[in-house]
């Protein structure tokens, strides 16, 4: 009997161990299944780092947006609707006043203007060169809805005249700024004539309208420059009163834009910031952007 009892106890212990081992094996299988399921699910998205674009430039998301119903990602990136990319940054202007044309003295030389002599509450935006062609310019011009004059250099634009054609179609007026962007001051008559007349002729061929105004590179000119501008059929040489670069407006006189001032900026990397800064300076002075060509007969 004693042997039988001991044998029964050993059998019971053995059966208990088998049950424990089976339970452990089931737990391990469950853990492996859970791990496999976790690795098959989408990885957690890491938040994108802040944009390195210059301020003022619209940045479209690199990640597709979710549909309103909470479904899968849409096929295209989420972009602002047309006409709203710069909403909130562009000042609003009313219609400019009916222009009062200035008196241009007669003679054998073109007048030299850095300001239009007018009491009307207007200022003029001019943009030079054309080396850097920011894609935002077209939408910016459309949204702002203000007149601008582009003084273009042939060598800067000849690789992509279609870019400037689109700006012209949006309302910009194209003027001349030489072929090669060399300083004209002190150069021979023949050199200046080639640069001044040649640039106007080529721009007329490219864009269907010959320029009526001219700006020498760096604002540098001499008596020959003004004489050749006149001989080439253009009405005036242009300088400026304010410049804009990297979103900062710099004034030659005082700390505000004055009625009739000509503002200079360039086609640069910070084009958006510069253009908006020019508009904000005009608005802060209580003025309205107007078209330069409307004031020069």
Listing of model-derived features with the role each one plays in the protein:
Residues 130-133, 152-160, 183-189, 215-221, ...:
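Acidic-and-aromatic substrate-binding clefts and catalytic sites of carbohydrate-active enzymes
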Residues 12, 25-114:
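N-terminal low-complexity, Pro/Thr-rich disordered segments
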Residues 2-12:
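Bacterial N-terminal signal peptides that target proteins for export
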Residues 83-176, 180-183, 202:
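Active-site beta->alpha N-cap acidic-glycine motif
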Residues 27-29, 142, 147-149, 173, ...:
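CE4/NodB-like, metal-dependent polysaccharide N-deacetylase domain
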Residues 210, 220-256, 289-296:
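His/Asp/Glu-enriched short active-site or ligand-binding loop at hydrolase and phosphoryl-transfer sites
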Residues 20-23:
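C-terminal motif of bacterial Sec signal peptides marking the signal peptidase cleavage site
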